[in-house]
Amino acid sequence: MAVDSNLSSPLGPPACEKDAKALRFIEEMTRNADTVQENLLAEILARNADTEYLRRFNLCGATDRDTFKTKIPVITYEDLQPEIQRIADGDRSPILSAHPISEFLTSSGTSAGERKLMPTIKEELDRRQLLYSLLMPVMNLYVPGLDKGKGMYFLFVKSETKTPGGLPARPVLTSYYKSEHFRSRPYDPYNVYTSPNEAILCPDSFQSMYTQMLCGLLDRLSVLRVGAVFASGLLRAIRFLQLHWSRFAHDIELGCLDSEITDPSIRQCMSGILKPDPVLAEFIRRECKSDNWEKIITRIWPNTKYLDVIVTGAMAQYIPTLEYYSGGLPMACTMYASSECYFGLNLNPMSKPSEVSYTIMPNMAYFEFIPLGGTKAVELVDVNIGKEYELVVTTYAGLCRYRVGDILRVTGFHNSAPQFHFVRRKNVLLSIDSDKTDESELQKAVENASSILHEECGSRVAEYTSYADTSTIPGHYVLYWELLVRDGARQPSHETLTRCCLGMEESLNSVYRQSRVADNSVGPLEIRVVRNGTFEELMDYAISRGASINQYKVPRCVNFTPIVELLDSRVVSAHFSPSLPHWTPERRRR
């Protein structure tokens, strides 16, 4: 298709006229970032002027930035929790937003062990869809020909519930996949998936994964990109193929869907897709029966050009494994988003994972940034390259000066919009998938498990640290325990220590427990008991590397390979959680 030269973009030559318009929109927003931000805040404040929250701080209809920042405090979820609970309980008065709260998006972050509830309004779907619509126009600048094939993406809906007041409470991606924006999306040759909607929307994770993988195998030569939301999700899909390849080959050979797939909509959908193909079945058997799974992605899907997965932050730990399975394919991190707000996109999606930077789109929300170690928030356009900041957002849905908890480092600017490298989540100690465990949660879990130990054999945990082990699929938490066994007390049995593992899991937050029970994205927690004196050796090692003996504290999480190796060399026994912890979609009442 010929592209109107008036629609060209400084980002590069667009693939089509639709792309050209999207790229020009990015240019317009980023060139005028400060004006866009000023106008956006004024619009939010004018719209929500009569809400209970803004009236509480006597804003009196003011819409300028100075008055806003003088009168409205920077807050955390706990500050807003009473208002959110009232909305959840059914209060429909304009508490936070002049527009009705349509649902709650459940964050992977937690408060008092439960997922945080982020209020949202219907029009936010349009805003999120707008950001999605910018991703492929940017990708097409770097990878040509994506309209000639399909994407094999492993996408899933998760458990949802309703609040006491009847509002849905569900993860942001579940909300999006169930929306008309996704289910009735118009045909776009640059955005065709191998997975049918029926498989993506199936609430049974096994049936959904099975069907999506089967469709990807049937369409293997059409696949040009392979992806999931997180790197860990793509690795679970590969592990699923390792476990079930013989069943896939059987289905493909006979053209019959496995009897364990009982979802009626899936069975009806697959009846028009699955036909006998003995040649493909034999190919799958030949490739998958080998113990060598190196480059398995490009062996089965030979036309794959890149992986579309998040490999920044905690997901960076999966990069070596993905490189092994893909043969070193590029990994594209395309966008930066959360339950609170969608933030921006990667304008150089083929960059190395360690160099990924996201450009903040100033039309998504009003953004402020608190310098690390500081207190005064600065504007979007006033951040400094090389500095680290905590992200603060004000949204149309009623979050005002809300601390998201993400730590970002400024790497540069695109026009006047800053570009950020995601550094970490504030206070997060352990993470395998969407789970996030902080130090206080881990400490509480260890204390509860230590009580089990004391009750059963009189022992206690003398010292501990932890490690997110991603060498297994799925990954799992490892706790290194040094025990204090009193004179005359018996050594704890294997059964006691496995109960300690389960006791810890029961003490962790609901996102962790959902990951274990419903999503199968985290494996059983492991306790590795180390011999006495190990943590003194750990301190000696740290001091030998320059740590101050007066200021040394035992790290509650380790990831430096020599330290992990030191701990593993001192392990005297290992124990795993014997069963799944308790979890239901229902939220605990506070």
From Swiss-Prot:
GO biological process: one example: response to auxin
InterPro entries linked: GH3, GH3_C, GH3_M
EC number(s) stated in the UniProt entry for this protein: 6.3.2.-
Top-level taxon of the source organism: Eukaryota
Name of the encoding gene: GH3.1
Full protein name: Probable indole-3-acetic acid-amido synthetase GH3.1
Pfam family, one: GH3_C
Induction remark: By auxin.
Functional note: Catalyzes the synthesis of indole-3-acetic acid (IAA)-amino acid conjugates, providing a mechanism for the plant to cope with the presence of excess auxin.
Family stated for the protein in its record: Belongs to the IAA-amido conjugating enzyme family.
UniProt organism field: Arabidopsis thaliana (Mouse-ear cress)
